[in-house]
């Protein structure tokens, strides 16, 4: 498998929300489930800012950790308690984001799924139970 070699991805992180659209007339959130800027802020804080321009490595991959330790100061490495496959990252991202998805407008929001795309044609998803 090509994946055994050290490599990176330009991930795309997608949250899939479910809830009731606000129907109250005259309020600024009428017709909305949530303001997308709120979702973006949650994803930036709990996913993007954590992994952006970082090398993701499994905590038990001693060979990779050894190689990464020889890199220059300032190299961003995120050590994970799981192998960083798209499938595992989708589960991890779901767990990071789900507690922060709240009912913004009294509409009982839930995080239905989280999708992680490695490429435009390759992705993995983690769904709520």
Which residues are covered by each model-predicted region?
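Charge-rich, low-complexity N-terminal segments
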Residues: 1-129
């Amino acid at each position: 498998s090509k994946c055994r070699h050290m490599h990176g991805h330009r991930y795309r992180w997608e949250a899939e929300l479910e809830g009731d659209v606000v129907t109250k007339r005259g309020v600024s959130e009428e017709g909305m489930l949530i303001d997308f800027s709120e979702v973006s802020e949650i994803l930036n804080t709990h996913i993007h800012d954590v992994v952006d321009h970082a090398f993701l490595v499994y905590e038990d991959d001693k060979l990779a950790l050894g190689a990464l330790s020889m890199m220059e100061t300032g190299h961003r490495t995120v050590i994970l308690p799981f192998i960083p496959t798209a499938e595992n990252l989708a589960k991890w991202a779901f767990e990071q984001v789900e507690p922060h998805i709240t009912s913004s407008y009294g509409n009982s929001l839930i995080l239905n799924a989280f999708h992680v795309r490695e490429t435009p044609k390759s992705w993995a998803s983690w769904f709520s139970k």
